[in-house]
């Protein structure tokens, strides 16, 4: 499969490397509006400068591409994704699906009308840590899940568009964790209460810290807290998690997974908590491909053979509604129902 990559700076580096590693995907061309980025990346990745175009329509006209990879900032996703599908091409886009819920729904509408694949790069789903958590929860070993907590604290200095966003943490980072909640629970959010704020030392223009309480179908509850301007004791990018289950607890800390199971509940003895087994560290699931490599492989398979692709625009719109529901709850101070 031959692809046009739109945007080759910043996060584009990750996709340049993923395509160059793939035995099934090659570059037909690139789109980059910044001449300095085009020059630097052509040298760093040995790209043919003649294949770097200024616009997607120009690249579509000049190449024989089969698909498009969109790595532009969110405000351009609607334009790029719809242009690709209007040209008859499947598209794999970086998250978020779009910069606004209206734009995201417009992309979904075109995907539905055209029947073309529009995939969203929710790469955090495809990591050994994530797949192990999902497998343990689905096994039923710890019984029914009643509640979960997630905490994320880091202090990255990105520069660029993220530092100008109104809700940088929620829209650009927490979207991963909210999407993982959907994956882990097999449910969509139904009601959200949330607050966001910006600490005095923040280098972000918008709110870089937030806390949320989420209710899912069947009354399952989740709490989330996070910050993108934390100054110490950082969590991993995957966040720390705690899953409260019927017969034990699954805890994730610093990318390590621990389980402890309840062996006997001392219901008749006041003040006694019951008997538990020893805390076990769970081995991580082995994966032949991870992250963007996994997504690229699955996208290629789905686009060429019609196999299923989990994070289509049609599925991911529920993650977008979740994310924008959190932002609406932060802005309004009221509980948002989805």
What does each model-found stretch correspond to?
Residues 1-47:
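N-terminal Rossmann-like dinucleotide-binding module
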Residues 15, 34, 51-110:
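Beta-loop-alpha module in the N-terminal Rossmann-like domain of NAD(P)-dependent dehydrogenases
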Residues 67-69, 217, 298-338:
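C-terminal helix-rich "cap/oligomerization" subdomain common to oxidoreductases
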Residues 117, 124-204, 213, 333:
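Predominantly a Rossmann-like dinucleotide-binding segment in NAD(P)-dependent oxidoreductases
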Residues 14, 33-36, 283-296:
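Active-site loop of classical SDR/Rossmann-like NAD(P)-dependent oxidoreductases
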């Amino acid at each position: 499969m031959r692809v046009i990559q739109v945007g080759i700076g910043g996060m584009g580096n990750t996709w340049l490397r993923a395509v160059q590693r793939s035995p099934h995907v090659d570059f037909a061309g690139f789109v980059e509006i910044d001449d300095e980025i085009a020059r630097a990346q052509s040298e760093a990745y040995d790209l043919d400068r003649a294949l770097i175009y200024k616009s997607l329509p120009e690249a579509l006209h000049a190449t024989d591409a089969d698909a498009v990879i969109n790595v532009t900032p969110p405000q351009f996703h609607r334009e790029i994704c719809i242009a690709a599908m209007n040209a008859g091409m499947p598209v794999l886009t970086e998250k978020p699906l779009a910069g606004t819920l209206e734009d995201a729904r417009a992309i979904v509408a075109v995907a539905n009308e055209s029947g073309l694949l529009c995939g969203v790069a929710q790469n955090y789903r495809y990591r050994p840590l994530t797949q192990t958590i999902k497998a343990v929860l689905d096994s039923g070993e710890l019984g029914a899940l009643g509640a979960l907590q997630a905490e994320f604290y880091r202090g990255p200095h990105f520069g660029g568009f993220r530092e100008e966003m109104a809700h940088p943490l929620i829209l650009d980072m927490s979207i991963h964790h909210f999407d993982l909640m959907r994956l882990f629970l097999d449910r969509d959010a139904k009601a959200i209460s949330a607050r966001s704020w910006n600490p005095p030392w923040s280098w972000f223009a918008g709110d870089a810290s937030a806390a949320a309480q989420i209710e899912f179908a069947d009354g399952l509850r989740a709490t989330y807290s996070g910050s993108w301007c934390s100054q110490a004791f950082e969590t991993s990018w995957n966040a720390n998690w705690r899953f409260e289950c019927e017969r034990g607890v699954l805890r994730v800390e610093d990318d390590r997974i621990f389980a402890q199971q309840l062996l006997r509940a001392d219901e008749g003895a006041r003040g006694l908590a019951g008997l538990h087994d020893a805390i076990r560290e769970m081995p991580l699931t082995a994966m032949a491909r991870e992250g963007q490599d996994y997504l690229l492989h699955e996208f290629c398979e789905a686009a060429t053979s019609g196999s299923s692709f989990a994070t289509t625009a049609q599925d991911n719109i529920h993650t977008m509604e979740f994310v924008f529901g959190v932002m609406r709850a932060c802005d309004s101070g009221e509980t948002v129902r989805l």
